[in-house]
């Protein structure tokens, strides 16, 4: 299956990636400290920059009953490019337990 996905997504450039930002705790969105709020403001500023650059299509929190998480849809060249974008996010660099899961979209309707 991985080989199939690699071939399918390699054929399209730029490619679209579904990036899921998993916060450090399930209730994070409801229990932010002032320091975490400032970090989230830096995160939002970073995402706005990606939107201006044309690398981000949409982003926002998802109301998952198990706990909110962040959705980021990127349109970049490769999965390595998507990883570089997510690794550049202030929340990912913060060392506070945020992590991204990145999956290529097999197709998109835009």
Predicted feature residues:
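Conserved, structured core segments of small domains
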Residues: 1-110
